[in-house]
Amino acid sequence: MSRFSQVFLSLKPSRFKNEIKGIVGYWPKDLSLYKLALRHSSAYPFRKKKGERNNERLEYLGDAVIDLVVAEALFYRFPKEDEGYLTKLRSKLVSRNNLNRVADELGLPNLLVANLKGNHGDSIYGDALEALVGAVY
């Protein structure tokens, strides 16, 4: 189990709730979606059954939400720009590097349950951010 998994699993529910409140700005009623959002598929590498619970589905939802919110903001912020400009700007704003940076600034690496010994690329924290956005949505 990774250091991050140990930190996450050792958090008391009240402390975890405080951490989530600090990130999302409100007191969550049900922590289960937030815990799921911070559970990477690598945390349980031998459990690959269909329907296994990890953050991938929330990541999918959060990715779409982030794209929509950023697209709408750019649409109204730059009313004279064409679709190509808006698409390029959105791509830069929601790039993996930016999502990883935001996730790091929010402290998500300290809450993520993951086995970091494997090769998961550099997207694991940005993916967790997307999953957290999916949980909020």
What are these regions (language model features)?
Residues 2-137:
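RNase III-family endoribonuclease catalytic core
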